[in-house]
Amino acid sequence: MSDSQEIPYHNQLKNRFRGYFPVIIDVETAGFDAKKDALLELAAITLKMDENGYLHPDQKCHFHIKPFEGANINPESLKFNGIDIHNPLRGAVSELDAITGLFQMVRRGQKDADCQRSIIVAHNATFDQSFVMAAAERTGVKRNPFHPFGMFDTASLAGLMFGQTVLVKACQAAKIPFDGKQAHSALYDTERTAKLFCYMVNHLKDLGGFPHIASELEQEKTTEKETAL
């Protein structure tokens, strides 16, 4: 008997989000226009589910990125995120290397979880998704694992669960430590967002909100049919 057969249906990651593999992402940029402004930093964390159906952070990648040729650089954005694009200690790589590395990590995790496609999870996710997709288009990296427009927005989810939409406030509500001095570092914000998303998914499970009774009944019917065949 395989591991997936031994683990209950709803405790398998591939069955939690309709076949989607969730990947937490945060970006730091030189503006708000994904087509014109530079992508300067990107971090991503994949997730795994244990045999009891609880979600946990898993693999991570993090890149400082060189502005693409002709990119706009908004000084106000650099002042906000504290990035010095001329600092040689950044160890910045090209967009091509960053997106290639991201996609490779995500595809491996997606395959290991037996998921059909990956989906971006981010705080105010439209922003992060737009920059990832624009960079993928610029670089021409093939086999983009992400859904082209679907996403999970932790700002919306936290607003529903806690009445808080700001990341630090949502983390505080979930009793997740948050160091404001490290905020606006893509890696730190991704780590906090990953913990927040896992907390919300796991807390919903603890409250009895998942699996929903209707989906449980449907799964029982499916299992009965398979057993009868």
UniProtKB/Swiss-Prot annotation:
The UniProt record gives the binding positions of Mg(2+) 2 as D26, E28, H184, D189
Keyword Secreted in the entry? The reply is no
* Keyword match Iron: no
One GO MF term attached to the UniProt entry = 3'-5' exonuclease activity
Which residues make up the annotated site Important for substrate binding and specificity?
F32, F80, F127, F149
Q: Name one GO cellular component term.
A: cytosol
Provide the binding site for Mg(2+) 1. Answer: D26
User: What quaternary arrangement does the UniProt entry report?
Assistant: Homodimer.
Descriptive protein name: Ribonuclease T
Organism encoding this protein: Haemophilus influenzae (strain 86-028NP)
